[in-house]
Design a protein with these regions (language model features):
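Alpha-helix boundary/capping residues
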Residues: 58, 82-85, 115, 143, ...
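Helix-hairpin-helix/helix-loop-helix acidic hairpins
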Residues: 56-103
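C-terminal accessory module of base-excision DNA glycosylases/AP lyases that mediates lesion recognition
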Residues: 1-54, 118-195
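Short hydrophobic alpha-helical segments that form membrane-spanning helices or hydrophobic packing faces
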Residues: 107-114
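Broad structural signal for hydrophobic residues in well-ordered alpha-helices, predominantly aliphatic
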Residues: 96-97, 112, 163
């Protein structure tokens, strides 16, 4: 079954929620990882240090020891294969473990988000990749499946691309809006449902 996503908030509010976004780590919301993405996009791969920094940003260090098992050679080789593939299925699954130790679909989606077209450019939204995250999924009224599948991933990508185009925002701004809406509302909604 292909999932159907629908936003929990009006599409007209996407820019407003994007502007409220705050995921500060060390004083920088996402500027550093966007710089890494630009460099990786030009080079066609991530270096190990860049990979580790992006993984740290996404996961706040939870599976750090797994990420650190990846060698410089492995990170460059695997990310180059993923970023150069024309096959969408291979593009995402090449990055997921055992491709890169510790990497699951959410982290793989960040690597694609940052290095496949400029995620800050609204004109690139039809080719850009969203970040798959429980917060963004909640904002789109969908739960993360028990098992990651390409069907789920691709439906999410297509939904986010269409939503970004419809709202005239970049994929980065759409991601920020979905994340921030959940950040400010998900726990409140769950608390009122349990009363």
């Amino acid at each position: 079954m292909t999932p159907v996503f629908s936003s929990r908030f009006p599409k007209s509010e996407v820019p407003e929620w994007a502007n409220r976004y705050s995921y500060t780590q060390g004083g920088d919301d996402d500027g550093r990882v966007l710089e890494i993405g630009e460099r990786s996009r030009r080079a066609g791969y991530f270096t190990r240090d860049e990979f580790l920094e992006v993984c740290e940003w996404k996961t706040r260090g939870r599976p750090r020891r797994h990420y650190q098992r990846n060698s410089e050679e492995d990170v460059r080789r695997v990310t180059a294969m993923a970023l150069s593939s024309a096959d969408e299925d291979k593009r995402i699954w090449t990055l997921v473990a055992p491709g890169l130790a510790g990497v699951q679909m959410p982290t793989a989606s960040v690597l694609l988000h940052l290095a496949s077209g400029d995620p800050r450019n609204p004109l690139m939204a039809p080719q850009a990749y969203p970040i798959i995250d429980f917060r963004a999924l909640w904002s789109l009224n969908w739960e993360k499946p028990r098992r990651d599948t390409f069907t789920f991933w691709w439906a999410y990508v297509q939904t986010c691309r269409a939503l970004a185009v419809e709202c005239c925002v970049s994929m980065r701004d759409l991601d920020r809006a979905l994340w921030e809406y959940s950040n400010q509302n998900q726990n409140k909604a769950q608390n009122t449902c349990s009363d």
